[in-house]
Swiss-Prot record:
HAMAP family: GTP_cyclohydrol_A (MF_01527_A). Converts GTP to 7,8-dihydro-D-neopterin 2',3'-cyclic phosphate, the first intermediate in the biosynthesis of coenzyme methanopterin. GO terms for biological process: tetrahydromethanopterin biosynthetic process. Keywords: Hydrolase, Iron, Metal-binding. Belongs to the GTP cyclohydrolase IV family. It comes from Methanopyrus kandleri (strain AV19 / DSM 6324 / JCM 9639 / NBRC 100938). Its cofactor is Fe(2+). The keyword Metal-binding applies. This is GTP cyclohydrolase MptA. Its EC number is 3.5.4.39. It catalyses: GTP + H2O = 7,8-dihydroneopterin 2',3'-cyclic phosphate + formate + diphosphate + H(+). Pathway: Cofactor biosynthesis; 5,6,7,8-tetrahydromethanopterin biosynthesis.
Length: 325
């Protein structure tokens, strides 16, 4: 039906300046991902949808973006296909259709986050627990002479536990000093003899206490239709790159195990990022050299009011050169 209302968005703007991204953000949607022979996965997801706006146009037609999102989600629900990497494909389909619907735009971008719940077992008591993981999809489409070209990324954000190596070593030395002075006072030993004995008592393989942080690790990897990356693999890499995993449920034996595991594997925020990098290069050796990789770690400090941050933005090729792979 032909609209009788004026198309204000297509009018000339007062200030003819090109805008890089215009759109709608924070759209909440239920995303039902069908899987062959398995129960569908339902994600509570948030979408950000953007297109660029030419200098000669006042505004974008925002309702078109919402219509595109709804159409693609309905098509996905009717589909019989599904895989671990479907979210970046979903973002790709949305971004391409945004350019088809917004014929004045030359670039579109889709960013999606969702919460994936995975079944786990506690480390000692083996009780069932459900653990939440934030999964991320992103796609950018550009209009070119050869048609629409799209680049897409998939990733995850995982919460874990880190233990501070610096405080751990300080506590070890502090423990040796306390034991040394106790030996000198109670056994009347000379300082050198007491120091040697204290070193044997406070052994290097005994890990003292240290302060902990709740770590948040993030990996985003560029993928293509040919090269796939499993979200489960990304989650595993992030989780194993911290001092210890966290759990929604912990009985006392489990709590002891997690605490000891963290102290036995202390890591700075920088260590976590470098460990993720090493595991990415090993696990995804089939990815092309030009695949973009973003690795980030934020540790929420327990003894400071600020957080610790480390990040690497690079390509698989650069990482292979650095690690000699």
């Amino acid at each position: 039906m032909r609209s009788c209302f004026p198309d204000v968005q297509s009018a000339d703007p007062q200030i003819p300046a090109h805008l890089t991204r215009v759109g709608i953000s924070g759209i909440k949607k239920l995303v039902k991902i069908p899987r062959r022979g398995k129960r569908s996965i339902v994600l509570v997801s948030t979408f950000n949808l953007f297109v660029d706006l030419p200098a000669h146009q006042k505004g974008i037609h925002m309702s078109r973006s919402h219509e595109v999102l709804q159409e693609v989600l309905e098509e996905l629900e009717m589909s019989v296909e599904g895989s671990d990497t479907v979210i970046e494909d979903l973002c790709s389909r949305i971004s391409r259709r945004l350019l088809e619907r917004h014929d004045y735009a030359t670039r579109s971008e889709v960013y999606m986050t969702g919460e994936l719940i995975l079944s786990r077992r506690t480390p000692v008591t083996k009780l069932p627990t459900q653990e939440p993981y934030k999964i991320i999809g992103r796609a950018v489409s550009k209009r070119t002479d050869n048609g629409i070209e799209t680049r897409k990324m998939v990733g995850a954000e995982v919460v874990g536990l880190t233990a501070c190596p610096c405080a751990l070593e300080m506590m070890r030395e502090h423990g040796k000093e306390r034991v040394k002075h106790r030996l000198m006072e109670e056994l009347d030993l000379e300082e050198e003899e007491a120091e040697d004995l204290a070193k044997k008592i406070v052994r290097e393989d005994v890990h003292p206490m240290t302060h902990n942080q709740r770590g948040v690790g993030t990996i985003l990897i560029e993928v293509s239709d040919v090269h796939r990356v499993s979200i489960n693999d990304i989650i595993e890499i992030i989780e194993e790159s911290m001092s210890a995993p966290t759990y929604e449920l912990l009985k006392r034996p489990d709590e002891l195990k997690v605490t000891c595991s963290a102290c036995e594997n202390p890591k700075f925020v920088e260590d976590c990022v470098r460990e993720m990098i090493r595991r990415i290069v090993e696990r995804f050796d089939y990815l092309p050299d030009d695949a973009v990789v973003i690795v980030r770690q934020v540790n929420k400090e327990s003894i400071h009011k600020h957080d610790a941050f480390a990040e690497r933005v690079t390509t698989m090729g650069e990482l292979r050169k650095e690690l000699g792979s």
